[in-house]
Amino acid sequence: MSKKGRVLVAMSGGVDSSVTAVLLKERGYDVVGLTMKTWDYSTSGGRDGKEVGCCSIESMNDARVVATEHGFPHFVVDLREEFGDWVIERFTDEYLSGRTPNPCVLCNTHIKWDALLQRADDLDCEYIATGHYANVRYDDERDRYLLSRGLDRNKDQSYALWGLPQEHLARSIFPLGAYEKPEIREMAAEFGLDNVADKPDSYEICFIPDNDYPRFLKDRVDGLEEEVSGGTFVLSDGTVVGEHDGYPFYTIGQRRGLDLALGERVYVTDIDPETNTITVGPKEELMEQTLTAHEINLVKYPELDGERPAWGTIRYNDDGAGCLAWQPDEDTLKVAFAEPKRAITPGQSLVLYEDEDVLGGGWIHEVGGAENEAAERAAEAPA
């Protein structure tokens, strides 16, 4: 057994996870590689034989080659059933409820970490590691494990990890959090990872590699297209201005693909699944200053006592804005931003930061409705 300990590394077959595994081995850890097969087209509503990215045979073979060439064991685990139940079902249900889901957060919280920790225990591994650009450390004063942004702000993935509880963070290692992406590609070349060093980054949803989520929903839900077609576009005053293809195929803030000639640019400002109605309007009608989030997870503190200044983000790659956050009950966060935010979208993640640390997060449930006075105080609070 290595003095550093035994670590189970999630390996997708990409450059980040491959460098993570080899870097930890170079640092003296006893490394075990694990590739998780989470989906295929036959079980997730698509066409057989079209797997690409992290669940393709090529990617699994790339991970195996890295492990073999660097002398550590590698395993593959089939998580398609769990992924389908937790991620794909909720993804589908959220769109059918008029919300816009974030499947990566669900996968990290309920699939990847649960599966990694279970297999880590089976393989006598003390730690798990991934190629996420984030950092974790133990804070003696708070007696808590803290999650913080990665050094490379362009690649920072702390937003997608807000749902990890303390017991998961306690066993997690993120070696790439201290590096920028160009350094990782340089390391890949230095380590001789020729099969992955120049692989392009992946930005699409892993189980929708063509990024066509309306097509995915139509493939997955029998009769959906016929059921929801013929809905109406309306203005905020109720004036009907056109027909649409069905409410699940649109998202808050969308402008392209509306096929409306109204003499000005309009955006989706509201989605009503009950009436199959989509409200459109000018950009100004997308601006909101308050929100409510549920299913929360607090990282830096066990609970929030009163209003706390924070930096709030409402989607991946959102620059964020100063805000006040408070916790009216165990499972709810309310947030008032110092200035109105564009297209706050139910179903997306709210993530709060305090300096570089993740304060906590939750799923955006309701937009507006929080106290106007709180928004005024947020404008005066330190960012």
Swiss-Prot record:
One of its GO terms (cellular component) is cytoplasm. ATP binds at A10, M11, S12, G13, G14, V15, D16, S17, M36, G131. Signal peptide: none annotated. It comes from the Bacteria. The record marks H132, Q348 as: Interaction with tRNA. Its EC number is 2.8.1.13. Its main location: cytoplasm. InterPro entries: MnmA-like, MnmA-like_C, MnmA-like_central, MnmA-like_central_sf, Rossmann-like_a/b/a_fold. This is tRNA-specific 2-thiouridylase MnmA.
